């Protein structure tokens, strides 16, 4: 998305979701089933609205803030997801879960090193709203997964909704694109498609408190791509952050594994 240059936020959002909508549509056509699960429409609409607002706010923040600042604000999403899951889905997170998320967030701070200034208050607010929207969207996805809604339908409904809502603004504020810009936007859309299917599948099968820590692995991949495409070599603070994030993820994995083995043992005794 950064390589696509200075294009309107709505235009970037439209192309970002267009590819995902087409891919999900092809999957549904192959399955020959466009039917929604009973009672899933309200959650699909809420997921789509929250996700669309989250994307627009995040892209606005990226365009008006330092990329590092926009990234750290988007990393608020797991916090919001755990809060929404507790409020809306009545999921309980232990103090260990909360502590690990805070530790992972601290690791992200080491990597991103945000530097806010007073003049950037509105874009920063938009970035925080982007994290809130993403967190609510993840919560809705987990709820829909519990109702048996298919991943392809969730991705298609959201992507189509986002494209349709962005289309009028894209037409009004359309900026001509060069072939490289169009190629980068389509490539971003393809990458987003893979990410959407993966994240939707993950949040469909597990609660936010079990997934949120792993969301910070994105920081590691961002560093890899930054080095590959922009020759951005991480400093010592970044490496400290990587160690904190990976450590939190490993501890979370071990805790989840221990809990699962304990639950299985309890079931066998019954």
Where are these regions (language model features)?
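Membrane-interface interhelical linkers
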Residues: 21-46, 95, 152, 160-187, ...
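Juxtamembrane C-cap of transmembrane helices in multi-pass membrane transport proteins
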Residues: 1-7, 56-67, 73, 137-148, ...
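Transmembrane alpha-helical segments that form core, pore/gating elements
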Residues: 2-5, 9, 24, 116-177, ...
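Helix-helix packing/entry segments at the starts of transmembrane helices
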Residues: 71-76, 148-160, 196-227
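Juxtamembrane helix-entry segments on the extracytoplasmic side of multipass membrane proteins
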Residues: 14, 36-40, 113-132, 171-187, ...
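C-terminal transmembrane-helix exit sites in multi-pass transporters
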Residues: 60, 77-99, 220-239
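Hydrophobic transmembrane alpha-helices of multi-pass small-molecule transport proteins
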Residues: 96-113, 237-256
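Hydrophobic/small/kink-forming positions within alpha-helical transmembrane segments
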Residues: 25, 48-56, 78-83, 108-109, ...
């Amino acid at each position: 998305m950064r390589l696509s240059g200075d294009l309107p936020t709505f235009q970037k959002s439209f192309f970002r979701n267009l590819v995902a909508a087409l891919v999900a549509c092809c999957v549904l056509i192959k399955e020959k089933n466009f039917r929604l699960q009973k009672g899933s429409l309200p959650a699909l609409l809420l997921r789509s609205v929250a996700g669309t607002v989250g994307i627009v706010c995040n892209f606005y923040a990226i365009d008006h803030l330092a990329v590092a600042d926009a990234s750290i604000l988007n990393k608020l999403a797991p916090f919001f997801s755990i809060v929404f899951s507790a409020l809306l889905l009545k999921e309980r997170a232990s103090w260990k879960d909360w502590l690990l998320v805070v530790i992972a967030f601290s690791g992200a701070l080491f990597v991103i090193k945000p530097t806010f200034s007073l003049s950037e208050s509105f874009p920063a607010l938009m970035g925080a709203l982007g994290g809130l929207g993403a967190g609510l969207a993840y919560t809705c996805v987990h709820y829909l997964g519990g109702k048996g809604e298919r991943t392809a339908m969730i991705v298609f409904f959201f992507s189509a909704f986002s494209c349709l809502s962005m289309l009028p603004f894209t037409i009004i504020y359309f900026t001509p694109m060069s072939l490289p810009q169009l190629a980068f936007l389509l490539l971003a859309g393809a990458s987003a498609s893979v990410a959407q299917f993966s994240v939707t599948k993950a949040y469909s099968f597990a609660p936010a408190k079990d997934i949120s820590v792993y969301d910070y692995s994105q920081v590691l991949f961002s560093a890899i791509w930054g080095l590959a495409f922009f020759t951005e070599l991480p400093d010592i603070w970044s490496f400290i952050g990587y160690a904190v994030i990976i450590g939190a993820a490993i501890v979370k994995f071990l805790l989840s594994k221990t809990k699962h083995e304990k639950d299985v043992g309890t079931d066998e005794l019954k």
